[in-house]
Regions:
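Gram-negative (and chloroplast) outer-membrane scaffold detector with strong preference
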Residues: 48-109
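Short glycine/proline-enriched turn or capping motifs at secondary-structure junctions
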Residues: 3, 132-141
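Transmembrane beta-strand segments that form the barrel wall of outer-membrane beta-barrel proteins
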Residues: 27-39, 61-72, 96-107, 124-136
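Structural signature of outer-membrane beta-barrel channels/translocons
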Residues: 52-58, 86-92, 120-126, 133, ...
Length: 147
């Protein structure tokens, strides 16, 4: 709990390097494509649509991302809820490059979720990322448009 409070404190006191407004809560729509790595020499693509919320701006050190999406494919179909922390290592006035990680809860049968790692580019109105979930052998890409 102390680490979580420290993370929120770091997010709230992060100093802005740009002239952006003070908005720190962004909501958006999300689209993704997952490509489950082959178990039997077949690739199983899945497609997802959902909504995301980002707490923090691209010019701050840390962003917290969550949301819900529905993924559909041959290997996995169901709702997923990611809770991720992104660290903006390459911060600019309008864009940032980040590394992130967290847990993605799944509501598909007896499977409950997996750790998720990602790297991407973020702007005020978008997030473009590549992610990997080692437990599932899931390599994918996603795009979020924030309003």
């Amino acid at each position: 709990m102390k680490k979580f409070i420290a993370l929120l404190a770091a997010l709230s006191i992060s100093v802005s390097l740009s002239g952006q407004d003070d908005k720190v809560l962004f909501t958006g729509i999300d689209a993704s494509m997952d490509c489950f790595l082959p178990l039997d020499r077949k690739v199983y693509p899945s497609f997802g649509l959902g909504a995301r919320v980002r707490l923090g701006r691209p010019d701050q050190w840390v962003n917290l991302v969550s949301g819900v999406r529905y993924i559909h494919g041959k290997r996995l179909s169901g709702f997923q809820v990611p809770i991720l922390v992104n660290v903006n290592l390459l911060r600019g006035k309008r864009f940032s490059g980040y590394l992130g990680g967290g847990f993605e809860f799944d509501f598909a049968g007896t499977y409950y979720g997996a750790m998720k790692y990602q790297a991407g580019l973020a702007g005020r109105h978008f997030d473009l990322r590549v992610f990997y979930k080692p437990y599932q052998g899931d390599l994918g890409t996603g795009f979020t448009f924030y309003f």
